[in-house]
Amino acid sequence: MASFKRDLYLFLAVFLSISGVWSFSELFFIKEPHDVTAMRRDAVVLDCQAHGEAPIGIRWLKNGVTITESERVYSLSNGSLLISEVESRKDKSDEGFYQCLAQNKYGSILSQRARLTIASLSTFTQQPASIIVMEGSVARFTCKITATPPPIITWEFNRVTLPLATERITVLPSGVLQIQGVEQRDAGSYRCVAANIVSRRRSTEATLTVTPAMSPRAPQRPRIIAGPQNLTVPAHSTALLECMASGNPRPLISWSRADHKSIDVHKTKVLGNGNLIISDVNPQHAGIYFCRATTPGTRNYTIAAANITVLAPPSLVEWPESVTRPRAGTARFVCTAEGFPTPQITWLKNGEPVRSNGRIKMYNSKLVINQIIPEDDGIYQCEAENIQGSVLAMARLIVVMSDNRPSAPRNIRADTVSSSAIVLAWDRPAYNSEKVIAYSVHYMKAEGLNNEEYQIVIGNDTTRYIIDDLEAGRNYTFYIVAYMPMGASRMSDHVIQHTLEDVPLRAPELSLTSRSPSDIQVSWQPLSHKLSRGRVSAYRLSYRTSSDGTLTQLELSAHKTHQLLEGLQPDTTYLLRIAAATAVGWGEPSAWSSHRTPKASSTKVPLAPELQLESLNCTTVTLRWHLPAGSSSGLQGFKLSYHEEGQSEAAQAQIPPHHRQHTIGGLDPRKKYHIKLLAFSFMGDGYQADQTISTPGCVSVRDRLVPPPPPPHHVYAHSNSSSSVFLHWARPAFTSAQTLNYTVRCNPVGLQNASLVLYLQTAAQSLLVTDLEPNTNYEFAVRLHVDLLSSPWSPVVYQTTLPEAPSRAPVGVKVTLIEGDSALVSWKAPDDRSAAAVTHYTVLYATRRAWAAGDWQMLQREGSITMALLENLQPGQVYLVQVSASNQMGDGPFSAAVELTIHTDGHAHRTHGFSHATVFSDGFYHLDQRSMAGIAVGVCIALTCIIICILILACRSKTRKSCTTKSIRQAGGQTPPTAVRLANESAAESVEVMMPMMRDHFIDAKGGTNLIINSYGPVKPNIEKKRRKRWSFFKKNEKEVKKVSSPAYSYHPGTTLLCYTETSPENPPTTLQGLFGPSGGDSEGSHSSEGSHETSDSGRYSHDDTEATNVSIRSRPASLQDDGNQTPVHEKQLETTLQEQEMTDLHPV
């Protein structure tokens, strides 16, 4: 019973479809419009009557656009178009092509085209000209005019109409007047008259003058005065070939064909004396005709030739037939036409042009519709058209739909897997899903026109599929259809998804020329989307000389296609290459291209030709070029050379100067060739144009049928160590080959040097990549090789190698003594890019004796902290301090030991309050403001104490002031050690120098002014008035202070020196070092040693040349610097001398 019902349904479906075709066959045209020529203001009717199932609607189109009806132009009840008054103006004309469109419920059909032409008669384009001929010779007049319809031309002699043909006179339809055997009575005035339905026009008059003939006439060889002209004529029209010859005796005219075929005598006749007329021309009459003028009785002749081209309107040889197809089926229509020129085939659906897309394809004369949907139902027409007209044929496509068909697959999803793969997933149809026997996956590029649609059929056991043969960086459209025995479902919803970008497949081809001896013009063509594999984001142009390895690189924006390199060396060979990048990274650079700059003396030779290369096929390249303006003078030719990349350059071939094109054959497929072309003149060889081109592969059947394999899937990277990464991947699905090889690409992210890209080969599905840089982010990609085919690169994966333990110690280690038993250690992070961030620092410190015994104390600080406080230090000891950095990978090396001397209690007592010593690991001493930031509070307290002391000292007796000042001046005119400033402040910032501990008489307030303050107040040479206002509280001693200013002080701008004297020193200095600090020479120190010996100063000076100069100034008075071998002066005596000198300066006699 079920089988019977199924057969009944099929019978009804076929019957209904057949009846539908029969109903459709009733829609056709009874009358169609035809070409018409009308005069202005005439009424015109264009016929159009259609027959078919009612109701039938008719609408008109002019030049493909629907006509808007008006009182002047409107449709009649029978469908014809009436133009009551034809107009012909520049802004508004009724001329054009007209078609009518008939429509009923089955669809629409379009009529043939009809041309409406407005009759006209223009002025003459060629007037007859006066001539002088010899009696007995021939005469010929001609006139030409443009008119619609073609005019009838007659001639008048002395304003009397001539007969169209006599024994001696012939009037040709083309407007030519021929006179044979001219006589004296033929002399006179001639003019032509052209007339058609519009009007009549007369040409200007031309005079024929006849001269007497010589007696007897000398023999003359035959000469063709007016030979035949090439003709292009429509079929079924008349063709006229003129042939007029002169000679003595009168020549005989004969005709023949070049193909030796006989001339059709039934439709051919001779008009006048040798003019050939062919009536009712058809394609068989086309060909080359020879006119031969022969002297009678001799073999003397002359020949003229002309070609006749016959235009034939289109005619159908094979026309489409109506078909009935189920949903998701395929329909094919065939339409073949002939004519000349070859007709162009256009397909229409319901009167509208068919748009080619993924489902609908047009192959020459065929229309193929895949995956038919209900909307494809309609009337299809094939229109064959050329300049002679058009012809149409029609057929209907009926789409049959089954009631038991499944619904469309639901919830289609697309996810990008890689630059060439997208995975599709969907849900089964909601209706009749159990009857689904298969699915078809359809996809095509979303951008552009005429994209190919691809179809893949899979079983019903899955709702997921990976498409892995896509182009990188492209948008694709996907949809899915479900199939069951009775038919197919509707299409699913369309989804658009894009593939990932990849690095460019190759670099652009370079074109190199020079405009002068010191530049190179580099140009290139943008990469195609298939080669760029995404949007190009930048170019990198590299160049160098052939003899120098120094490489210059230029980063260029993506929109640039040329770059001028200037400032180059003349007569030098340069190597250039280019690389392109997408958002993913840089592709492989091109091979080096060489170009030699012209010699400096080559300024008058021809400039480089502008060269264009094109691959005709896999073994042939065509060169086209042209010279810049002004470079053709004196040109003697061109020189061409080419060679395959990596091969030696071949000999030059010379090309004639008038050639601008050359073909190179016999090349190898898939090879890169370097081509060089230059022009040469008598001045020498010109500038050279260099270009590279890659020949394509020869297309074979195998290339067309076998797609490239998919790339490996699931690439995974794992860091094994600081120099190795382990890679593994999965074999791509649907790859049945047994022998597979893989290429692994590895390079650092943001690579600047393409030579660092690693390419590793393996047959396994895993690889350990070694010899990598620590703590560096790398990118990896894998491609598959099978059967001489290569897959695209897999998606790029990123992995960072593990970092190393710090390989360098902290730098800038310094120790600052802030109290008698406390010191501040500070440092800077090590400069080690291969190591991870520092997690903590370790500070080791101990006395010399404990250090030697391995008994040291340790402090640890977090990686963000770069200072530590050492407390409970023992007085009178020398401490050694070292710092190291550590991270999660391990501990780094320790810095060089820094020595710090802790003073005894008595010494500390003499220091009075704040005193600091800064020690550097590199042996230099420096007052670093950043290190003082950590003890800002202490500094503020110290400054407050100093200000209080100054105010107290300002009130002391003048006797003590005089004594102090005098003692200083007698010391050789030098400022105390702490008053000497470094040569420049930048040196003080970079070369850190420890200042000796302050004595009781000298306090460095590190002010930003040039004041010198002793116990009596501020002292400044040539002090400015506005500066004195800031020290107004010292006005009572201002006069005496001015007297203190003396050359005895070594004055340095930007330094404030505070000088004071103790009221009653309990512990006077016992040595010279106690007053002036350590000696500048320090014979026991070395550049590499750090810290100081057990002395009252807190460190050792460097023996650096610049620093030694400053230190010697600080350490000794001028009286001791004159001679290094003088006997040391006792400190007590020196102090007394200085005090006496100071008293003398303050109280002059």
Swiss-Prot record:
<dbReference type="InterPro" id="IPR013783">
    <property type="entry name" value="Ig-like_fold"/>
</dbReference>
<dbReference type="InterPro" id="IPR003599">
    <property type="entry name" value="Ig_sub"/>
</dbReference>
<feature type="region of interest" description="Disordered">
    <location>
        <begin position="1060"/>
        <end position="1149"/>
    </location>
</feature>
<keyword id="KW-0732">Signal</keyword>
<comment type="similarity">
    <text>Belongs to the immunoglobulin superfamily. DCC family.</text>
</comment>
<feature type="glycosylation site" description="N-linked (GlcNAc...) asparagine">
    <location>
        <position position="460"/>
    </location>
</feature>
<feature type="topological domain" description="Extracellular">
    <location>
        <begin position="24"/>
        <end position="932"/>
    </location>
</feature>
<dbReference type="InterPro" id="IPR007110">
    <property type="entry name" value="Ig-like_dom"/>
</dbReference>
<feature type="domain" description="Ig-like 3">
    <location>
        <begin position="222"/>
        <end position="309"/>
    </location>
</feature>
<feature type="domain" description="Ig-like 2">
    <location>
        <begin position="122"/>
        <end position="209"/>
    </location>
</feature>
<dbReference type="Pfam" id="PF07679">
    <property type="entry name" value="I-set"/>
</dbReference>
<feature type="domain" description="Ig-like 4">
    <location>
        <begin position="314"/>
        <end position="399"/>
    </location>
</feature>
<feature type="topological domain" description="Cytoplasmic">
    <location>
        <begin position="954"/>
        <end position="1149"/>
    </location>
</feature>
<dbReference type="Pfam" id="PF13927">
    <property type="entry name" value="Ig_3"/>
</dbReference>
<feature type="glycosylation site" description="N-linked (GlcNAc...) asparagine">
    <location>
        <position position="720"/>
    </location>
</feature>
<feature type="domain" description="Fibronectin type-III 3">
    <location>
        <begin position="605"/>
        <end position="704"/>
    </location>
</feature>
<feature type="glycosylation site" description="N-linked (GlcNAc...) asparagine">
    <location>
        <position position="475"/>
    </location>
</feature>
<dbReference type="InterPro" id="IPR013098">
    <property type="entry name" value="Ig_I-set"/>
</dbReference>
<feature type="compositionally biased region" description="Basic and acidic residues">
    <location>
        <begin position="1084"/>
        <end position="1106"/>
    </location>
</feature>
<protein>
    <recommendedName>
        <fullName>Protogenin A</fullName>
    </recommendedName>
</protein>
<dbReference type="GO" id="GO:0016020">
    <property type="term" value="C:membrane"/>
</dbReference>
<feature type="glycosylation site" description="N-linked (GlcNAc...) asparagine">
    <location>
        <position position="753"/>
    </location>
</feature>
<keyword id="KW-0217">Developmental protein</keyword>
<feature type="glycosylation site" description="N-linked (GlcNAc...) asparagine">
    <location>
        <position position="230"/>
    </location>
</feature>
<feature type="disulfide bond">
    <location>
        <begin position="48"/>
        <end position="100"/>
    </location>
</feature>
<feature type="domain" description="Fibronectin type-III 2">
    <location>
        <begin position="504"/>
        <end position="600"/>
    </location>
</feature>
<dbReference type="InterPro" id="IPR003598">
    <property type="entry name" value="Ig_sub2"/>
</dbReference>
<keyword id="KW-1133">Transmembrane helix</keyword>
<keyword id="KW-0472">Membrane</keyword>
<feature type="disulfide bond">
    <location>
        <begin position="335"/>
        <end position="382"/>
    </location>
</feature>
<keyword id="KW-1015">Disulfide bond</keyword>
<dbReference type="GO" id="GO:0050768">
    <property type="term" value="P:negative regulation of neurogenesis"/>
</dbReference>
<dbReference type="InterPro" id="IPR003961">
    <property type="entry name" value="FN3_dom"/>
</dbReference>
<keyword id="KW-0325">Glycoprotein</keyword>
<feature type="region of interest" description="Disordered">
    <location>
        <begin position="646"/>
        <end position="666"/>
    </location>
</feature>
<feature type="disulfide bond">
    <location>
        <begin position="243"/>
        <end position="291"/>
    </location>
</feature>
<dbReference type="InterPro" id="IPR036116">
    <property type="entry name" value="FN3_sf"/>
</dbReference>
<feature type="glycosylation site" description="N-linked (GlcNAc...) asparagine">
    <location>
        <position position="78"/>
    </location>
</feature>
<keyword id="KW-0812">Transmembrane</keyword>
<dbReference type="Pfam" id="PF00041">
    <property type="entry name" value="fn3"/>
</dbReference>
<feature type="domain" description="Ig-like 1">
    <location>
        <begin position="27"/>
        <end position="117"/>
    </location>
</feature>
<feature type="domain" description="Fibronectin type-III 5">
    <location>
        <begin position="809"/>
        <end position="905"/>
    </location>
</feature>
